A protein has these predicted regions:
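Beta-strand-rich extracellular passenger or scaffold domains
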Residues: 1-186
Length: 186
């Protein structure tokens, strides 16, 4: 359990035992450093080997960078556009897995960077991604058997780099179930 982070340094979470998770709570909005979670789990979110990060709220994620390399993450509390995650999500080659409760929607207002795959098996849910996507070169995908919507923008202004919304090579796909990819920019 981590309850309270602040400052601009780097926190690297150690590998943990299978079927365990780090629980991070409190309002960590003053944390502007980097929280790194990488290691053993090459199948983030696997029920046989869950080693994910559980955040109490969007504010528990801080306002720095969350670097994920083979670790899943989720939030206890559903957030809104007004309480969006403001941390930068940096996804490395082993990828990450958005876990949580089906039927819930999550809002991410921070940037996405890196070249890994962000996947989820959540059903009947939305992930609103309203931050800068120009530094992201990976993939957004969905596994499972229900509908999931990746919503880029939420009637918000788009950040573009040389006219591009994403970095080169981004892939939007459904590996199972049904994925919708919506774009809503002003």
């Amino acid at each position: 359990v981590i309850n309270g982070m602040s400052g601009a340094g780097r926190i690297e979470l150690d590998n943990q035992a299978a079927k365990s998770r780090f629980y991070i709570s409190g309002d960590n909005s003053s944390f502007t450093g980097e929280l790194v979670a990488s290691g053993l789990n090459n199948n983030p979110g696997s029920t046989n080997d869950a080693r994910d990060l559980q955040f109490a709220t969007a504010a528990s994620m801080g306002r720095g960078t969350l670097t994920l390399n083979g670790r899943g993450f989720w939030m206890d509390a559903v957030n809104t556009a007004d309480t969006a995650v403001m941390a930068t999500i940096n996804v490395l080659e082993k990828g990450t897995y958005l876990n949580g409760g089906s039927g819930k929607s999550y809002y991410f207002g921070g940037a996405f960077t890196g070249s890994g795959t962000v996947t989820t098996a959540l059903g009947d849910a939305f992930a609103y991604l309203t931050g800068d996507m120009t530094g992201f070169h990976g993939a957004f995908t969905r596994t499972g058997n229900a509908l999931f919507t990746w919503a880029f923008g939420n009637n918000t202004a788009a950040t573009l780099n040389d006219g591009k919304l994403f970095g080169d090579g981004v892939v939007l796909k459904a590996d199972g179930g049904t994925s919708l990819f919506k774009f809503s920019y002003t």
